[in-house]
Amino acid sequence: MFRTVNGEDYSPAVQQRNILDFGKSHSRLWTDNGSANDRCETGGNCRESGQDRVKRPMNAFIVWSRDQRRKVALENPQMQNSEISKRLGYDWKMLTEAEKQPFFEEAQRLRAMHRDKYPGYKYRPRRKAKEATEIASRRLFSTVQPNAHRGDVVPLPIQGRLRQGHTFTNGKPVKPLTAHEHKQLTPATGASQQLDKPAPQ
């Protein structure tokens, strides 16, 4: 399965050692010629493809974890990225302040470079699609219809989520309708008698 070329051993252990040695001697490979994310971190072009979004400068943990992540991944090729992240977080917490200091200094240097390159930069996190949908849903349910009458069920603006099925009437929680009660109601009839029952505590 393994072959010898020019008398060199190409076993997995030797290959892994060669990769690590290559990475140490060619560290610019990992930074200047890396991905767009790496180019941003080293002061290169920080704009994402097709967007005018500037990435944040790296913090001390990210500076430290970049090289550590590569080492852990090479030592444990079967390890999932989420497991590597957990391990790196634990290892970072175990470092002393003196061991972390060079990474804080490098992060400070990168922050200063970023500030010089983008003087008007302000961090604006992108909202995920799910969050945007939830916000739109809250806005929809928090608006009062102009034809709503006193005593009608009026959705209120909410912070977070309510238990499914509970609603409010005049600011008071009311008992959710059962399937049988719901069938008895028609769109033309009011539900004031059902809705005026206080919610169980």
UniProtKB/Swiss-Prot annotation:
An MF annotation (GO) of this entry = DNA-binding transcription activator activity, RNA polymerase II-specific
Q: Which GO biological-process labels does this protein carry?
A: cell differentiation; male sex determination; sex differentiation
Recorded hits in SMART domains, A to Z, give: HMG
Cytoplasm in keyword set: yes
Q: Where is the composition biased (Polar residues)?
A: 186-195
Which InterPro entries does the record match to this protein? HMG_box_dom, HMG_box_dom_sf, SRY, SRY-related_HMG-box_TF-like
Q: What is the predominant subcellular site recorded for this chain?
A: nucleus
- Region (Disordered) residue ranges read 162-201
Q: Which residues bind DNA?
A: 54-122
Which cellular components does GO assign to this protein? cytoplasm; nuclear speck; nucleus
The cross-references to CDD domains, in alphabetical order and at most eight, read: HMG-box_SoxA_SRY
Q: Which Pfam families match?
A: HMG_box
Keywords assigned: Activator, Calmodulin-binding, Cytoplasm, Differentiation, DNA-binding, Nucleus, Sexual differentiation, Transcription, Transcription regulation
Q: Where in the cell is it found?
A: Nucleus speckle; Cytoplasm; Nucleus
PANTHER family for the chain: SEX-DETERMINING REGION Y PROTEIN, SOX TRANSCRIPTION FACTOR
Q: Could you give the subunit structure recorded for this chain?
A: Interacts with CALM, EP300, HDAC3, KPNB1, ZNF208 isoform KRAB-O, PARP1, SLC9A3R2 and WT1. The interaction with EP300 modulates its DNA-binding activity. The interaction with KPNB1 is sensitive to dissociation by Ran in the GTP-bound form. Interaction with PARP1 impaired its DNA-binding activity.
Family to which the UniProt record says this protein belongs = Belongs to the SRY family.
Role, per record: Transcriptional regulator that controls a genetic switch in male development. It is necessary and sufficient for initiating male sex determination by directing the development of supporting cell precursors (pre-Sertoli cells) as Sertoli rather than granulosa cells. Involved in different aspects of gene regulation including promoter activation or repression. Binds to the DNA consensus sequence 5'-[AT]AACAA[AT]-3'. SRY HMG box recognizes DNA by partial intercalation in the minor groove and promotes DNA bending. Also involved in pre-mRNA splicing.
Full protein name: Sex-determining region Y protein
Q: Which organism is it from?
A: Orcinus orca
